[in-house]
């Protein structure tokens, strides 16, 4: 079975890194000291629920470990880094095991990181911030555009873009999102505020007053309203129907582009002999 890692990043059969095969490999299973294993430095998941680990530990205690963990050897003698199976490794630590069954794989940093990121994304157990970080790392590791990554992961480009935009928020907002103190929709609403101090101030209002998403959006609109009033769109009075249709079509197209996550800036002016629309699109998605 070809793992999505290979379909996504175009690995040949020779370079095949099939994480399903990794889990069920027929290669020799050896015993490695639990204390000699380090967690995957590229692991996007930052929160491991203690209760879930305890439940897994009880299952392993009762039935044994059915699947070995997968590791790669580090430069230090007898030291290994996890590739797959961190929850199982944490569970046997909880049980106080001295050794654990493992398979050793020879993988580069890029391969190790990609396997960890893809596996976690597919299991859909990440928080939105962890998911955003995973997308960001994959973009960097493989020099992909947001559109290319979205296509290879089978997701909408707007989904990837919207998640990545969350990483622009202040650390305090990201922490609140990571801790599930606010929802993703709350966080996406805060992006509409351009000043970091405003974002943090509204975050405090959300937490202190228990604002729902609609109340948060209304509060943000209230803050942005004075700025928006300074730049009213021309009404194009006295123009024929065809020109009005053309102008509205352009506006709708710009809204569609914005919905994909691309930050488009536009300015409309009515001059003596013509109407001018200036559009600015960043060369790189921020």
From Swiss-Prot:
Question: Which SUPFAM superfamilies does this entry report, sorted A to Z?
Answer: KorB DNA-binding domain-like, ParB/Sulfiredoxin
Keywords, sorted A to Z: Cell cycle, Cell division, Cytoplasm, DNA-binding, Septation
The record's subcellular locations are:
Cytoplasm, Nucleoid
- Provide the GO MF annotations for this entry: DNA binding
Query: Keyword Ubl conjugation, does the record have it?
Result: no
Keyword Cytoplasm found: yes
Got any disulfides in this one, which pairs? none
Q: Which residues bind DNA?
A: 147-166
Q: What family is it from?
A: Belongs to the ParB family.
Return the protein name: Nucleoid occlusion protein
Q: State the encoding gene.
A: noc
